[in-house]
Amino acid sequence: YSSWYSGSIEPEATFLSRFPDKRSTEELTEEDRRFIRDRYDENVAFADAQVGALLSILDSSKRYEDSLVILMSDHGEAFLEHGRYLHSRMLFREFLHVPLVIKWPRGVSGYEAEVAEPMSLVDLVPTLEDGLALPAQQEGYQGRSLIPLVFDGAHRQEPLWATTRRVDTYQKPPRPLEMLQAGPWKILYDPLSDSSRIYQIENDPGESQDLSGELPMRTLYLRQALLRQRTYNRELLQQAPEPGPIEDSDAEIQKQLEALGYLN
């Protein structure tokens, strides 16, 4: 994928040495940008090969048919669609749209379908409960089963919600950002500046046209829906058990996390 590249970017360099204090991409050439995309494609191809190897082991050991296999991702990756690289910095489609593939075990059939309707990763647990006929948990987490979508195409009633902390520079504290998607409408909300952007994602899947100035009442409605969802999330969080202690990681793990940009 990237063996053709002869530029200055060092793949093994740490995140902070490459982006010490900003997300500016002005110094990157078109060749650099193509190389970054190709390196990401290499990562995807490597992950695909590892998944294939795992499935081959399950198959050769006669365990594949009895296995529940779930393929998913925690986030997408940006390549300047909205002026940024990397991930977890904004809440546009390229950051949030990820795959979810479920291979059910032997004895669980009838769920084979491709669901195009947007869903949330919090829907995974209730989907597994329904699909495997497990006792449903009534408290402690959110989400809804996707099984009705398979059988009768029922549309999602609950909005999709996401949050992140935007890092503009490492000299400033992260800025919280929130997103709510209800049907074809999506709002991005910055609590610190109390500012909103809204998009009609059916007509504008690339989220390039902010309609908040043209549709102030729609913006207000979506903002109120987002704030209600935030309040509900916080109330639910109060019911969650206290997290256990985090054990100190060894030096090699800390080095890897720093290289990936998780520590500074």
Feature map (PLM): residue ranges:
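Catalytic domains that recognize anionic headgroups
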Residues: 1-264
